[in-house]
């Protein structure tokens, strides 16, 4: 036990440069590590997925890009959390890490045909949340981004979402190397059963793999020459009601705050904009160089 704790503590500096999600938070209550979140089989669980300088023989063009490498092998032993439509959730990073790469966060969902435990994620995915830049007057390579130094992605289950079992796929994209084709993807899947929902038709939808392309501007974006609007990847956020079919790419979105406020938000979940102050105590890590 003591050795395991020491190993976890030793990981903290590194995984704040590289990291992974392992805890589902439901209405402010943290669940156990991997209780409802699928693990993966990567030798180093915190390694990102990339198109260039590939790690663990894993790219965004592979089926495992849905939930991470080998994640489906853990599906049967992973629990399925019951959550109410309209409830506030979060996906938290493991071992005290924080997101210390500049870039956006997105959250997707996909409905299982029956049980989430037997679903590989090969169906349609729709986006329920995204957040980009919260303060365009801050350092565009660091704390201009809403996710900077946070330990979780917070989002809301759409109130109009039909009941059923779903996969939730949180994703953080590190853009520090995107100018060189080295965008880094950090993601996983949680298993949930939605209750008390509505009759909406989620959309637009994409597939994983296939929804992201190597030459998409979102993944070849340079943040090293000052602020510029960032083109959000994927479809637009579903806010309830009827979706609009499939989509392979979203519109170019201005996701910045206003000039008047350094803390105005750019977080979109169910069509709302919220502030994103740093609310949690963080452990800082050494600077990562790609």
From Swiss-Prot:
The record's free-text note on cofactor binding: Binds 1 copper ion per subunit.
InterPro entries (UniProt xref): AA9, AA9_LPMO
Glycosylation sites: 220, 254
EC numbers on record: 1.14.99.56
Residues covered by region (Disordered): 240-290
Biased composition (Low complexity): 245-275
Reactions accelerated catalytically: [(1->4)-beta-D-glucosyl]n+m + reduced acceptor + O2 = 4-dehydro-beta-D-glucosyl-[(1->4)-beta-D-glucosyl]n-1 + [(1->4)-beta-D-glucosyl]m + acceptor + H2O
Top-level class of the enzyme under EC nomenclature: oxidoreductase
Signal peptide annotation: 1-17
Binding site for O2: 176
Gene3D superfamilies: 2.70.50.70
MF GO annotations: metal ion binding; monooxygenase activity
Record localization: Secreted
BP GO annotations: cellulose catabolic process
Chief subcellular location: secreted
S-S bonds: 67-189
Biotechnology: Lignocellulose is the most abundant polymeric composite on Earth and is a recalcitrant but promising renewable substrate for industrial biotechnology applications. Together with cellobiose dehydrogenases (CDHs) an enzymatic system capable of oxidative cellulose cleavage is formed, which increases the efficiency of cellulases and put LPMOs at focus of biofuel research.
Activity response to pH changes: Optimum pH is 8.0.
Highest rank taxon of the organism: Eukaryota
Alphabetically ordered keywords of this record: Carbohydrate metabolism, Cellulose degradation, Copper, Disulfide bond, Glycoprotein, Metal-binding, Monooxygenase, Oxidoreductase, Polysaccharide degradation, Secreted, Signal
CDD domains noted in UniProt: LPMO_AA9 (cd21175)
Binding residues for Cu(2+): 18, 101, 187
Cofactor(s) required, per the database record: Cu(2+)
Biological role: Lytic polysaccharide monooxygenase (LPMO) that depolymerizes crystalline and amorphous polysaccharides via the oxidation of scissile alpha- or beta-(1-4)-glycosidic bonds, yielding exclusively C1 oxidation products. Catalysis by LPMOs requires the reduction of the active-site copper from Cu(II) to Cu(I) by a reducing agent and H(2)O(2) or O(2) as a cosubstrate.
Family recorded in the similarity comment: Belongs to the polysaccharide monooxygenase AA9 family.
Protein name in the entry: AA9 family lytic polysaccharide monooxygenase A
